Design a protein with these regions (language model features):
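N-terminal, positively charged/glycine-rich alpha-helical extensions of SAM-dependent methyltransferases
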Residues: 2-42
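Residues at secondary-structure transition points
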Residues: 27-30, 50, 54, 100
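Class I SAM-dependent methyltransferase Rossmann-like catalytic core
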Residues: 41-53
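Residue-level signal for short amphipathic helical patches enriched in basic/charged
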Residues: 50, 69, 91
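Conserved alpha-helix/loop element of class I SAM-dependent methyltransferases that forms part
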Residues: 53-71
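Class I SAM-dependent methyltransferase SAM/SAH-binding core
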Residues: 75-77, 81-112
Length: 112
């Protein structure tokens, strides 16, 4: 029985590759910011549902390995839509500051 999984994975990989190529081929910081601003509304769906992004969980694992959540202060530089901060908060970290160059990404993070 063919569930079409391989076809879906190829399509998703193609989308992921296309976005990465756009990011790598930007000519200026402003162009890169515009790209992330345009992507912000669908970023979480792309990285979580489509690509299976595990960065937040890996970050939580390693921070727990080296830090105690009580009293720890975390700076999430390049926080995007706040995916890491949400996961860290669920893992007991309470003092998390996020910064990002994209105002649209920060607006998405503020919703969380």
């Amino acid at each position: 029985m063919n569930c079409g999984c391989a076809k879906t994975q190829r399509r998703n990989l193609g989308k992921q590759t296309a976005i990465h190529e756009q990011v790598l081929n930007t000519k200026s910081t402003d162009e890169l910011m515009d790209l992330y601003d345009d992507w912000a509304a669908r970023y979480d769906q792309d990285v979580n549902d489509t690509w299976g992004y595990s960065g937040p969980e890996r970050t939580l694992f390693w921070l727990h390995h080296y830090l105690s959540p009580e009293g720890a202060r975390v700076l999430d530089a390049g926080c995007g839509t706040g995916l890491v901060a949400v996961t860290l908060s669920k893992g007991g970290f309470r003092r998390i500051d996020g910064v990002d160059y994209s105002k649209a990404m920060l607006a998405e993070a503020a919703k969380k």
